[in-house]
Amino acid sequence: MFWGALLSMERPTSVRDLCMSLKLSLLDLSLACKFCGNNITNIEKLLFDKAGFQLIWRENNAFGCCQYCARVCSVVEQCFGSHRHLTSEELVNVTKTLQQLSLRCLGCLSILSEADKELCAELNDFSVVRGKTRGLCSLCRLPP
């Protein structure tokens, strides 16, 4: 979608800010996935912001990322990047306290909540992928 009205303004980085800038509701906003080109569903628009992702701008067009492509990106990172297990003790020794860390989910790449980080610490369930520490969020822990 062309966002010509935003040429003179700073480009929004979240779906919410884009809706506010264009004075559109979330339901009326049409947003394509940068990777597959499909339109992102309304639920995926909400999850995009919850995950802490930022809109990608190309030639005055805003793009997001659908859930399927976020998961594929995570799998590709795990397959082609270095990947190792890390205990919570090692993590805190190497970095700061758990609460100060900004961690993403190993499955969907969303930012982990404090509860998710605590569960990962209890289970000693952290991974390092391409130099970045990851754990599983509560949604990715659900059985298929």
UniProtKB/Swiss-Prot annotation:
InterPro entries: E6, E6_sf. Disulfide bonds: none annotated. The keyword Zinc applies. GO terms for cellular component: host cell cytoplasm; host cell nucleus. It is found in: Host cytoplasm; Host nucleus. Gene3D superfamilies: E6 early regulatory protein (3.30.240.40). GO terms for molecular function: DNA binding; zinc ion binding. It holds the Pfam family E6. It comes from the Viruses. Keywords: Activator, DNA-binding, Early protein, Host cytoplasm, Host nucleus, Host-virus interaction, Inhibition of host innate immune response by virus, Metal-binding, Modulation of host cell apoptosis by virus, Transcription, Transcription regulation, Viral immunoevasion, Zinc, Zinc-finger. The keyword Cytoplasm does not apply. GO terms for biological process: DNA-templated transcription; regulation of DNA-templated transcription; symbiont-mediated perturbation of host apoptosis; symbiont-mediated perturbation of host ubiquitin-like protein modification; symbiont-mediated suppression of host innate immune response; symbiont-mediated suppression of host type I interferon-mediated signaling pathway. A zinc finger (unnamed) spans 33-69, 105-140. Forms homodimers. Interacts with ubiquitin-protein ligase UBE3A/E6-AP; this interaction stimulates UBE3A ubiquitin activity. Interacts with host BAK1. Plays a major role in the induction and maintenance of cellular transformation. E6 associates with host UBE3A/E6-AP ubiquitin-protein ligase and modulates its activity. Protects host keratinocytes from apoptosis by mediating the degradation of host BAK1. May also inhibit host immune response. Belongs to the papillomaviridae E6 protein family. This is Protein E6.
